[in-house]
């Protein structure tokens, strides 16, 4: 991404982009999100699917809450985490909503 975009955003909304990124490249997703947000900015993510083993391939690539914590807690602060109660039926119980803040 162009340097002029670095630090220009208060919020990034994640919805089904992360699950399309190969697990071997998710560190790049983390890096780009970090670059785009200004200090205090928020990455608001609805991460999916939590119940799909990586061995099944993708996309969508599976992810666990533990993996999300491992990736993002290195640089971010987790402000909130919840399981959505009003998901559509095919995704109910298979996604997590997380609010990550850039210090």
Locations of regions flagged by a protein language model:
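Short catalytic micro-motifs in class I SAM-dependent methyltransferases
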Residues: 16-20
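Class I (Rossmann-like) S-adenosyl-L-methionine-dependent methyltransferase catalytic domain
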Residues: 1-7, 21-103
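Conserved acidic residues
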Residues: 10
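A conserved beta-strand element that flanks and buttresses the S-adenosyl-L-methionine
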Residues: 13
């Amino acid at each position: 991404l162009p340097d002029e975009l670095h630090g220009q955003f208060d919020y990034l909304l994640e919805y089904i982009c992360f699950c399309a990124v190969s697990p071997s490249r998710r560190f790049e997703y983390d890096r780009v999100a970090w670059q785009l947000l200004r200090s205090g900015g928020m990455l608001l993510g609805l991460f999916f699917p939590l119940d799909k083993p990586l061995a099944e391939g993708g996309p969508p690539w599976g992810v666990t809450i533990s993996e999300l914590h491992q990736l993002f807690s290195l640089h971010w602060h987790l402000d909130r985490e919840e399981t959505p109660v009003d998901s559509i039926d095919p995704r109910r119980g298979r996604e997590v909503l997380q609010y990550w803040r850039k210090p």
